[in-house]
Design a protein with these regions (language model features):
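Soluble non-cytosolic domains of exported or imported proteins
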Residues: 14-22, 36, 51-55, 100-104, ...
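His/Asp/Glu-rich mid-to-C-terminal helical/loop segments that flank catalytic regions of hydrolases
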Residues: 29, 33, 40-42, 151-194
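Short C-terminal domain-edge/linker segments immediately following a structured domain
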Residues: 30-35, 75-79, 111-116, 172-177
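Alpha-helical metal-binding/catalytic segments enriched in His/Glu/Asp
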Residues: 1-55, 177
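Generic secondary-structure signature for well-ordered alpha-helical cores
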Residues: 36, 65-66, 111-115, 182-190
Length: 194
């Protein structure tokens, strides 16, 4: 799971993607705090060069997962990649990159959050974010859907300051990230691939 550390040249980057970074760190803290002993390793990675062309995630995939057509050692070990990169606002669902086989799993995983508005399961494929290299390598990769309240108005702009972050929304997102990572890591099988 991951997000990116870099931002546009003129943007402070609080929402894009500081909020995703914070949510990922908090998700890891939650899992550690409750003493999770996962069957599979939960790895969080923070990318550089996302805004300039997905350089960090592409380099990682090429070095450890798949180089061209050649599948590397990590390819068989990665069950899923969860990405948070669409601003600081509350999660409302998840994009599955047209991986329809995960629908029954994700519907069940989403149930505890139904009353919070986390209800949208979309087969839409999204791009221009760090899940793309994983998806292209055949790794199940997913982007959380967020309210566009602050992201659309301030992302990639000089107004992307931390005073616009709603910490309760970021905490909400962190709990969902932790839950999805936990469920993926506790499965005896890997998540279904397309």
């Amino acid at each position: 799971m991951g997000g990116h550390l870099d931002c546009y040249q003129m943007s402070p980057g609080a929402g894009d993607d500081g909020a995703g970074f914070i949510a990922m760190l908090e998700a890891v803290r939650i899992l550690k705090e409750i003493g999770v002993q996962p069957r599979r390793t939960i790895r969080v990675i923070f990318w550089g060069g996302e805004e300039q062309g997905l350089y960090g995630s592409t380099g990682y995939v090429k070095r450890y997962v798949q180089d061209g057509e050649k599948k590397l050692k990590e390819h068989a070990k990665i069950s899923a990649y969860f990405n948070s990169d669409y601003g600081p606002d509350k999660f409302r669902g998840i994009y599955t990159q047209d991986n329809l086989q995960v629908y029954p799993l994700f519907e069940a995983w989403m149930q505890p959050f139904k009353d919070t508005g986390f209800t949208t399961l979309s087969n839409r494929s999204v791009g221009s974010t760090d899940l793309v290299p994983f998806d292209e390598a055949g790794i199940p990769a997913f982007q959380f859907i967020q309210d566009p309240m602050e992201w659309g108005r301030h992302s990639h702009r000089t107004q992307d300051f931390s005073d616009r972050l709603v910490l309760d929304d970021i905490r909400h997102n962190a709990v969902i990230i932790a839950w999805f990572a936990y469920n993926a890591a506790m499965r005896s099988e890997m998540l279904p691939r397309k």
